[in-house]
């Protein structure tokens, strides 16, 4: 394991958060779900259910796409399946963005506008940012909670004990998600200017030729990863550009999780950290997920 270098920011997190809020940064309360552009409904849902154990918990049909919410290891994902994939074909399936709860949608709109961040979709009760000024991420904002308010699910969300003890992957929840960017300093400047964050650690990862900064954003840890030379991060950026690279789950037993995937014909690969294994996009309907023992 590569030693982590503390930024020294954590002890002053509350004070720094107050200062950030005063200068117009967005205070996110809770992550709601991670958004994925999927190529097809039946095959993606079958894979997510059979291999990852996903629950199909909400259906949102529409004229442009079929959207659904699925629950995997304590994390909600929204899958958007376009009626026709032609206009998405060159880019392929990918992580579109991530939704956070905020207290005031109107104030958040104003904060984004003041930073020259436009909206690509606004349905009133929620909205998505333009990806280009947001490091390739369409951030979505919502002023309610899927987790702490009543909601009419197709079936009840399975509790943490089920994912930890009853499912063979042994999920312990979301560990972090990673964002790959070509320019590390510019990426950190964006997050510092846009959101209330608490920087936790910095480290170099020579085995992936990557530079990493980890920070707390609401109830999630985000890892910003940039290339330091030729390697998997550089290749990822050449193919997909800036944006969400991977979602990392904690698991009770990494060997047991690997055995589960092997039973489905999937061999896990080395992840972006020395203690993670990954299911690669080619084996996971176009998106990378990682697993780390906790």
Positions of predicted regions on the chain:
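Accessory, usually C-terminal, subdomains that scaffold auxiliary metal cofactors
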Residues: 206, 231-238, 243-250, 264
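Short, solvent-exposed interaction modules
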Residues: 90-97, 108-110, 239-245, 257-259
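Short amphipathic beta-strand starts and helix->beta connectors
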Residues: 19-21, 80-85, 160-164, 227-233
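A broadly used, surface-exposed interaction patch
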Residues: 77-82, 87-100
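N-terminal beta-strand motif that seeds the catalytic metal site of vicinal oxygen chelate
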Residues: 2-45, 93-100, 147-188, 244-247
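Vicinal oxygen chelate
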Residues: 2-25, 109-170, 213-217, 223, ...
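Core segments of cupin and vicinal oxygen chelate
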Residues: 20-29, 35-76, 107-114, 120, ...
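A structural feature that tracks compact, well-ordered secondary-structure segments
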Residues: 80-82, 99, 103, 111, ...
């Amino acid at each position: 394991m590569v030693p982590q270098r503390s930024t020294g920011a954590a002890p002053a997190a509350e004070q720094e958060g107050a200062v950030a809020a005063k200068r117009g940064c967005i205070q996110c309360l809770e992550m709601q779900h991670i958004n994925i552009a999927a190529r097809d409904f039946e095959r993606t849902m079958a894979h997510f259910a059979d291999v990852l154990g996903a629950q199909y918990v909400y259906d949102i049909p529409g004229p442009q796409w079929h959207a659904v919410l699925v629950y995997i290891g304590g994390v909600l994902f929204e899958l958007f399946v376009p009626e026709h994939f032609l206009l998405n074909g060159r880019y392929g399936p990918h992580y579109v963005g991530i939704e956070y709860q905020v207290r005031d949608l109107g104030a958040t709109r104003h904060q984004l506008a003041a930073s020259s961040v436009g909206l690509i979709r606004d349905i009133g009760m929620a909205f998505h940012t333009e990806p280009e000024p947001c490091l390739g991420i369409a951030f979505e904002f919502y002023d309610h909670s899927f987790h702490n308010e009543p909601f009419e699910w197709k079936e009840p969300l399975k509790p943490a004990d089920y994912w930890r003890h009853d499912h063979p992957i042994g999920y312990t929840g979301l560990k972090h998600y990673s964002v790959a960017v070509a320019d590390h300093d510019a990426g950190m400047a964006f997050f510092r200017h846009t959101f209330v964050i608490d920087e936790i650690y910095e480290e170099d990862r020579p085995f992936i030729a990557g530079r990493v900064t980890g920070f707390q954003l609401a109830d999630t840890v985000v890892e910003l990863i940039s290339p330091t030379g030729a390697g998997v991060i550089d290749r990822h950026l050449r193919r997909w550009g800036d944006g969400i690279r991977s979602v990392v789950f904690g698991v009770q037993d990494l060997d047991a999780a690997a055995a589960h995937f092997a039973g489905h014909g999937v061999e896990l690969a080395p992840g972006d950290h020395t203690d993670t294994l990954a299911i690669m996009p080619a084996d996971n309907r176009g998106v990378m997920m990682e697993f780390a023992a906790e």
